[in-house]
């Protein structure tokens, strides 16, 4: 009996007949694994299942789905969630709960977001060790004079960065230190293309419904890189790590996130120098305030052929001359 076979006698598998919002992929893997892995990393859709994606999922037998009032026994594919410990130069940094794939990307991304590196050249090596029920990532960084990595240890209880066990570091990169270079406006069609194409490219989400995605999209709306993880922060860190490793110009496109428009996520992307961030869901006042000060163009509710620009609309190639008076007014507190 295949994993897509209904155990009560009918083929009611979610991946076969009732796909999650982003569709379903074939579970046939083999010679296409390498091509699929490359396609997944570049954001291209694929019918094959990569080795990374296979390792990041598990089959659960004995599930019961109620459909049209009728119960059906099925086998479901679920996303793996494992603890991953990261250390830098032999010093413990943090334990992440994440999807067990793309370890080098998340190592580079975390190092960049934490301010430990400014380019891929600052990393000497990344070693991944699989433990019984966890993973260990040991990152060796090229030393920078006067920089004390041990002062950036994380509290094992709260995960909040602390220095000398007393003075807390800022939880995000200060807006006044963000530098966004000049860039030509992004065509609005590129953002709607990303919105309409994201779910099609989320391989793990299509099979589990449990992952977030972070993508880097070019000015024509083509996906260049995409990362998935059960955690939205992990997905963004993996994307940043991939951009760092590939030395991608942050002004050559924009970031598109499947998650809520959270301050910490936009902050990490702005630190890399990305000037336009689009998300499928709502922003908060805090992220709007940060984006205004940091000179980041913030687009939210990016769904289908619609999106709302909250800050710095000059980076989107739109003409507001024909908009209603109410639409021309800047957003203000009431």
What is each stretch, according to the model?
Residues 98, 227-231, 283:
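Short alpha-helix boundary/capping segments
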Residues 2-56, 321-331:
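Intrinsically disordered, low-complexity terminal tails and inter-domain linkers enriched
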Residues 211-246:
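Protease-associated
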Residues 232-321:
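Feature captures the catalytic cores and cofactor-binding loops of soluble hydro-lyases/lyases
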Residues 2, 8, 36, 43, ...:
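Intrinsically disordered, low-complexity regions enriched in acidic/Ser/Thr/Pro/Gln residues
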Residues 125-129, 135-137, 167-169, 178-182, ...:
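Noncatalytic linker/hinge segments flanking ATPase motor cores
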Residues 334:
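Active-site/ligand-binding-proximal alpha/beta "capping" segment
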């Amino acid at each position: 009996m295949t994993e897509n076979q209904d155990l009560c006698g009918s083929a009611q598998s979610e991946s076969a007949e009732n796909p999650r919002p982003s569709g379903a992929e074939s579970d046939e893997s083999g010679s296409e694994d390498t091509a699929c892995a490359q396609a997944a990393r570049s954001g291209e859709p694929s019918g094959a299942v990569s080795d990374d994606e296979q390792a990041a999922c598990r089959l659960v037998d004995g599930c019961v789905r109620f459909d049209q009032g009728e119960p059906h026994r099925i086998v479901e594919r679920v996303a793996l969630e494992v603890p991953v410990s990261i250390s830098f130069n032999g010093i413990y940094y943090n334990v992440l709960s994440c999807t067990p794939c793309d370890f080098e990307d998340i190592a580079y991304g975390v190092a960049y977001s934490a301010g430990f590196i400014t380019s891929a050249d600052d990393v000497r090596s990344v070693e991944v060790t699989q433990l019984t029920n966890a993973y260990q990532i040991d990152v060796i960084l090229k030393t920078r004079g006067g920089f004390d990595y041990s002062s950036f240890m994380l509290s094992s209880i709260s995960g909040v960065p602390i220095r000398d066990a007393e003075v807390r570091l800022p939880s995000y990169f200060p807006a006044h230190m963000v530098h966004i270079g000049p860039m030509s406006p992004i065509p609005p069609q590129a953002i709607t293309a990303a919105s309409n194409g994201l779910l099609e490219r989320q391989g793990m989400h299509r099979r589990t419904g449990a992952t977030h995605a972070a993508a880097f999209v070019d000015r024509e709306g083509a996906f260049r890189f995409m990362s998935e993880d059960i955690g939205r922060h992990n997905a963004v860190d993996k994307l940043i790590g991939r951009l760092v490793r590939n030395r991608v110009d942050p002004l050559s496109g924009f970031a598109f996130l499947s998650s809520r428009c959270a301050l910490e996520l936009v902050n990490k992307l702005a630190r890399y120098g990305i000037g336009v961030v689009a998300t499928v869901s709502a922003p908060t006042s805090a992220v709007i305030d940060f984006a205004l000060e940091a000179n980041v163009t913030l687009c939210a509710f990016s769904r289908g052929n619609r999106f709302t620009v909250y800050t710095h609309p000059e980076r989107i190639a739109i003409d507001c001359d024909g908009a209603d008076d109410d639409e021309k007014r800047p957003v203000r507190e009431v």
